[in-house]
Amino acid sequence: MTQNHPLKWFSVVVVIVWCVLFLRAENTEKSIVRALFLEQTDTGWSAGLFYQFPEASADASETDAQIRFALASGQTPQAALTQTEEKLPRKASYRLCDYLVLGQESDFDTLQTCESLFLEHPYGRLASRVFCADFSGTALETQNEEDEYLPESLLDLLKSDKTAPHLYENRNGVLLPVLELNDGELSDREERLLLTETGQVTLTADQTEAALFLSGAKHTCQFQSETNPVELTSLAQSVELEGEDFHLVLTCRVPPDGRRPTDEEIARWETLCTETVRLCWENGSDLLRLSSVQALRDGTNTLTTKNACPEVRASVKMLDL
């Protein structure tokens, strides 16, 4: 028993040393991919990787290493990614790849291609937040040659948007933030791009606010008025079925430092909500899940966006808290 005691301690030390060496190799000997850029081109696909090396930690969401960018092309997304990985200083690790940026010619098929790619290969996660760019990978690569901190600015922009949809949410269409690159400066538009199985449409800034508000992506919205912007916070939202029509009820309040909207402004907001619901429906997105509301009442789901948009009216109830 006494003779085995030193051997046990030696075994424990060996295991600890092995774990330390393994974790060090896992953390510092890989190129940590933070975001993925994919676009379809005339000749195939382009894939860009925003990565960090070698100080990045595979177990932390915040890292200190400078973000770098590598771009390559291929006949398929996988081939393009393989070519891009060959440009990295070490083997790519996608454990912290939380963002997917689609190129300017992307459509709903591109989304589904990415979903299938992530399911079959470890290039990203279905929980990745999705964005759309109005620039090409080549334009980004060219600008990066002039500004080495551009990839870092882009990652900061991606991280700051908590309303971008996850890739797995694409079944009902997705409302994508649109990134711009003008004179070397990155920004995101107030207008968003709605991608659905049947097409795509760009929503205005107010329609975007309404869509994010109604979908639950934002609990506070701001829309323009003739004087100052009006800000509302959602307390509750319900959809009631009245015959074949729907009644959307929004219970809201004004933030402590905000002003109460006038009756005319509330009426405009109600109209904006119904117009946004109809616009999304006509482009293949059931923003309020009206089909589910009908199915709960009737027991069958016969209402789809292939049908004409049902009549929807909105009512806003203001509470003073």
Question: Could you describe each region identified by the protein language model?
Answer:
Residues 2-321:
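Membrane-proximal alpha-helical signals and transmembrane carboxylates
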